[in-house]
């Protein structure tokens, strides 16, 4: 399991193919069904009082979870998609965001930050962020139609896209899009300090021996989680 360099009261991790979660997590929550959208569900005392079935219904079609509760681990599942884990020591929140290319295109990270501002009065300059393992620009080859969707959505394509020889047919060039940088730019555009952003820099497509990759037709998923705890984690 990959764990991140965080303060002792914050536990953040991404699982590998070697095994599951090996940190102490008194309560672990993840969306019942991720749909590459932008919805966030708040994990609060009211949510915890629901039955397991009601919780599953509430988190169906959700791609981000946020909480300010201690010892509650919010998670998202990925396999080439980009996980973004957030925390704020001022408002005591943690947040887990599933940013696939479609969610990135819809600016899910920006949407989640707006939810944090509305629900918890979070100030973006107090946020810390981890961009976890996901497909890199070298491996994320896309067609012209995907490139055009990002361009029409107002993204800075000069900084996010480049052409490489085709991965299957090197006689033609194909667009590649940098989803790590795209999500980093969304964070900074909302006011997150660049110094507070960590990029894991792990390409799941290249390192499919250690991390699950949907483009490699791997069936498994990486669990990416974050929680606030009164006690340092124990691996």
Regions found by a protein language model. Name each.
Residues 1-235:
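Active-site microenvironment for binding and transforming phosphate-containing groups
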């Amino acid at each position: 399991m990959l764990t991140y360099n965080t303060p002792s009261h914050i536990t953040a991790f991404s699982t590998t193919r070697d095994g599951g979660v090996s940190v102490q997590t008194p309560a672990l929550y993840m969306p019942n069904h991720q749909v590459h959208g932008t919805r966030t569900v708040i994990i609060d005392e009211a949510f915890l009082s629901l039955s397991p079935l009601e919780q599953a219904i509430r988190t169906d079609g959700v791609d981000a979870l946020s909480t300010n509760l201690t010892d509650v681990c919010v998670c998202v599942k990925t396999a080439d998609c980009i996980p973004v884990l957030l925390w704020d020591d001022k408002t005591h929140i943690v947040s887990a965001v599933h940013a696939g290319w479609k969610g990135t295109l819809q600016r899910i990270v920006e949407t989640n930050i707006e939810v944090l501002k509305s629900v918890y009065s979070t100030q973006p300059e107090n946020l810390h962020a981890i961009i976890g393992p996901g497909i890199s620009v070298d491996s994320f080859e896309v067609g012209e139609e995907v490139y055009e969707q990002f361009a029409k959505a107002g993204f800075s394509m000069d900084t996010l896209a480049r052409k490489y020889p085709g991965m299957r047919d090197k006689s033609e060039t194909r667009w590649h899009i940098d989803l790590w940088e795209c999500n980093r730019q969304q964070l900074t555009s909302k006011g997150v300090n660049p110094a507070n952003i960590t990029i894991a820099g792990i390409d799941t497509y290249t390192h499919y021996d250690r991390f699950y990759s949907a483009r490699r037709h791997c069936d498994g998923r990486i669990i990416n989680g974050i929680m606030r705890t009164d006690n340092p984690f124990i691996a």
